[in-house]
Amino acid sequence: MTELVLIMVSAILVNNFVLVQFLGLCPFMGVSKKIETAIGLSLATTFVLTLAAMCSYLVQQYVLKPLDLEFLRTISFILVIAVTVQFTEMVVNKTSPLLYRVLGIFLPLITTNCIVLGVALLNANKAEFTFITATVNGFAAGLGFSLVLVLFAAMRERIAIADVPKSFQGAAIGMITAGLMSLAFMGFAGLIKL
């Protein structure tokens, strides 16, 4: 139980996949203009990350390793992620058509979000991970992504109404804000040693 809590805290705060490992920067910068869109994408991405972590672990342990096909790991994980995203897209379309329309092109683009493939590959590289720990790591990575995305969207909404100098408007102030946010998360660096 303690190990699972440490994995959660590590993936959410200490080794955040967006701010520390720089995975998932495209949706981080692209979808973070409105908090509603950021919440919707973060929920969908967390769902996909959790399912992809589970499925990729099962594919790795019960298909690729026994058949000595580990060199096909990246291709097989991309297929698993594509299927997971299609499933998520169908679920979101059925449960919340408004959210489906708001997310638009960003929902299918979760397939190409490098955080999803990165978590699957990092889980596969950790030999000590079990099915439960891989699933918890995927879920925690999604929570960490969600936390950062929603916080960044809230800051960008406030910056949009602030008096920002013309040379810093747009992407420049976004990058500065992301950098300061990354520095803030560096404060968690000594919290956990795995």
Swiss-Prot record:
It is an enzyme of class 7 (translocase). Keywords: Cell inner membrane, Cell membrane, Electron transport, Membrane, Translocase, Transmembrane, Transmembrane helix, Transport. Its EC number is 7.-.-.-. It is a multi-pass membrane protein. The chain crosses the membrane at residues 4-24, 39-59, 71-91, 102-122, 131-151, 172-192. InterPro entries: Ion_transpt_RnfA/RsxA, NqrDE/RnfAE, NqrDE/RnfAE_oxidrdctase. Its main location: membrane. Pfam families: Rnf-Nqr. One of its GO terms (cellular component) is plasma membrane. GO terms for biological process: electron transport chain. Part of a membrane-bound complex that couples electron transfer with translocation of ions across the membrane. PANTHER family: INTEGRAL MEMBRANE PROTEIN OF SOXR-REDUCING COMPLEX, ION-TRANSLOCATING OXIDOREDUCTASE COMPLEX SUBUNIT A. The complex is composed of six subunits: RnfA, RnfB, RnfC, RnfD, RnfE and RnfG. Belongs to the NqrDE/RnfAE family. This is Ion-translocating oxidoreductase complex subunit A. The lineage of its organism: Bacteria, Pseudomonadati, Pseudomonadota, Gammaproteobacteria, Pseudomonadales. The gene is rnfA.
